[in-house]
């Protein structure tokens, strides 16, 4: 046929058997990739430290999605929450990966079968004997089946009625675990951070899908609507399917980047807005304040801060700090976190407590400025020593650590004080191992950033695909350059399959 590469899909027009075949093969490729990627990630994943080296620091992409749906154990004897297990059961990480690979193989065989046996009776119109698909009926069947799956997921899997539940955590990502979730039928169900909304919305959407599917199975579209929306043309199906996919991609890009109950920070890492708003810093200060109110010393109050919470309050975990073209996991950037050094408190020679101004998200370098409780600049690390008035040396700044590995240690040496002031710009201070992975010290994004970028990019691409194919199917006669009612010698362009023998000819 000699088709150019961008026209090859012409071969499955008016050929329902092979159209089905290529879609089954596509499913085989997707499932095969998912299973293979899961096995690769399991081969390189280190589960030994879920607090300072969680899956999102290691650049895991498919493991978080399995985990949020209730998979926590491995046949290797470890659990994602830490510790060891003896009986992980069939639905472990490896079990899910294997199921995808087996499913991929079956789809591969089914695709070959449908490619060879393409001319099935079921695809033929009994009145004409020609290949024909009842597209509105197929739409009803698919809508009904997807409604059943959606309802089943919400009513059984998420609620724990028949399934494990989903990953649920507190607002600060400290206590996450898989547990059943009750549907939230009140207004709270519309809060994107309430897990109950996941159950209730799937139940509601599934019910709607079942009813809509039954409607489209039992009611035929009016002739004017059928012709106006070109419901008999397979390209109409392509256009509307692309619309559904790009809409879903835009939605999940939003829920991932801005955060929601479906994208827990324990599995995908914190969002950039939690750094921008000082979300974890405020909670840490609240806990320290509560400890001091109970007559704890500063050292005791800071020592009670969970290392996990302190680690979230570190700019290296901000997904917006990694450039789009910096390949690799976060651990390949600033290194593997080994331990929290503690919280540094800076004071000038007059005893005032000073706070280091933190680096905003989109800065690579930022001046080191220390302010007092009223926001007045009291010290800095000057660019030009000759004009400095607030240098660490001139102001006599000291630093003392509370909590962490350096608890109770203080420094007055200006070089050391400046070193920790620079590091305090980046949030809580951690010891990072850059030798093991030969980390280069340049921040990387988390899977949250990659997922968002990928889905937003493809959503935009698919949006144009929807416009393109929608325009082609709606204005097919215009693009072909003929009037469909014109009795021309050869109706060139009215038939989409090259070499179609049914093209009407007229002898002049």
Curated annotation (Swiss-Prot):
Membrane-topology descriptor: Multi-pass membrane protein
The keyword Membrane belongs to this UniProt entry's keyword annotation: yes
Localization per Swiss-Prot or TrEMBL: Plastid, Chloroplast thylakoid membrane
Xref: InterPro entries: PS_antenna-like, PS_II_antenna-like_sf, PSII_PsbB
Note on how the cofactor is bound: Binds multiple chlorophylls. PSII binds additional chlorophylls, carotenoids and specific lipids.
MF (Gene Ontology): chlorophyll binding; electron transporter, transferring electrons within the cyclic electron transport pathway of photosynthesis activity
Spans through the membrane: 21-36, 101-115, 140-156, 203-218, 237-252, 457-472
NCBIfam families documented for this protein: PS_II_CP47
Function text: One of the components of the core complex of photosystem II (PSII). It binds chlorophyll and helps catalyze the primary light-induced photochemical processes of PSII. PSII is a light-driven water:plastoquinone oxidoreductase, using light energy to abstract electrons from H(2)O, generating O(2) and a proton gradient subsequently used for ATP formation.
Annotated protein name in UniProt: Photosystem II CP47 reaction center protein
């Amino acid at each position: 046929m000699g088709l150019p590469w961008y026209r090859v899909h012409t071969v499955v027009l008016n050929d329902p058997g092979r159209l089905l075949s290529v879609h089954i093969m596509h499913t085989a490729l997707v499932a095969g990739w998912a299973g293979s990627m899961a096995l690769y990630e399991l081969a390189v994943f280190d589960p030994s430290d879920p607090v300072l080296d969680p899956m999102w620091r290691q650049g895991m992409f498919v493991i978080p999605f399995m985990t949020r749906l209730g998979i926590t154990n491995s046949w290797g004897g470890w659990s994602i929450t830490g510790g060891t297990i003896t009986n992980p059961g069939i639905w472990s990480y490896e079990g899910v990966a294997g199921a995808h690979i087996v499913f991929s193989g079956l789809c591969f065989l089914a695709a070959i079968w449908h490619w060879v046996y393409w001319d099935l009776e079921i695809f033929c119109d009994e009145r004409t004997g020609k290949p024909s698909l009842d597209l509105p009926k197929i739409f009803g069947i698919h809508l009904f089946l997807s409604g059943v799956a959606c309802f089943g997921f919400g009513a059984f899997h998420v609620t724990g009625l028949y399934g494990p539940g989903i990953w649920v955590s507190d607002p600060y990502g400290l206590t996450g675990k898989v547990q059943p979730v009750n549907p939230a039928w009140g207004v709270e169900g519309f809060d994107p951070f309430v897990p109950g909304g996941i159950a209730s919305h799937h139940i509601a959407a599934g019910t709607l899908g079942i009813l809509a599917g039954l409607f489209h199975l039992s009611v035929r579209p009016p002739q004017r609507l059928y012709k106006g929306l070109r419901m008999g043309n397979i390209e109409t199906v392509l256009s509307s399917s692309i619309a559904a996919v790009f809409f879903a991609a835009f939605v999940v890009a939003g829920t991932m980047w801005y955060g929601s109950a479906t994208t827990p920070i324990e599995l995908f890492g914190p969002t950039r807005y939690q750094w921008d708003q000082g979300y974890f810093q405020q909670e840490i200060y609240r806990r320290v304040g509560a400890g001091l109110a109970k007559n704890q010393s500063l050292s005791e109050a800071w020592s009670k801060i969970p290392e996990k919470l302190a680690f979230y309050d570190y700019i290296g975990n901000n997904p917006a700090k990694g450039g789009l073209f910096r390949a690799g996991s976060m651990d390949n950037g600033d290194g593997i976190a080994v331990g929290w050094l503690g919280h540094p408190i800076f004071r000038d020679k007059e005893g005032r407590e000073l706070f280091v101004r933190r680096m905003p998200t989109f800065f690579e370098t930022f001046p080191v400025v220390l302010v007092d409780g009223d926001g007045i600049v009291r010290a800095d690390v000057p660019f030009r020593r000759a004009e400095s008035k607030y240098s660490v040396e001139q102001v006599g700044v000291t630093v003392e650590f509370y909590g962490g590995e350096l608890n109770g240690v203080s420094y007055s040496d200006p070089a050391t004080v400046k070193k920790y002031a620079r590091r305090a710009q980046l949030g809580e201070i951690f010891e990072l191992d850059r030798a093991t992975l030969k980390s280069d010290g340049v921040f990387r994004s988390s899977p949250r950033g990659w997922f968002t970028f990928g889905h937003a990019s493809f959503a935009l691409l698919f949006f144009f695909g929807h416009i393109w194919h929608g325009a082609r199917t709606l204005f097919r006669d215009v693009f072909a350059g003929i009037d469909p009612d014109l009795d021309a010698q050869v109706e060139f362009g009215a038939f989409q399959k090259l070499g179609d023998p049914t093209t009407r000819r007229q002898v002049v």
